[in-house]
């Protein structure tokens, strides 16, 4: 098989490897009122009282962020964040296919350690974990260290 040719065809045909789907019914007014407003206010208030309830009342417990800056993509090197997106989508697809983990790609347009750390930290409340992917050394280790100090969720780098 010509993997380069077939992969390009697959990516063009499917226009991405992952998607977001609803887990709750959205068929009628009552469904929508439970999933969104006004019903959604009650889970919000419970989480406000105890932030850890976000793991019980939302999908956060099963959501992982897969992050790159595009600086060390597989054997391709520094190809930029947009060009790294197919790899991040692929990693997210692996998380779902083999671990049933909902993973989301984040391709950051910065090579600055503190900008990357701050960006991830600011959105970390939406995720149960962070996977640092294809960020060049030694910055990847510094980013991992700083995030572990700042965030209260698992941070790993492979």
Predicted regions, residues:
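Active-site nucleophile and cofactor-binding loops and adjacent substrate-binding regions
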Residues: 156-158
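N-terminal ligand-binding/catalytic initiation module
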Residues: 1-151
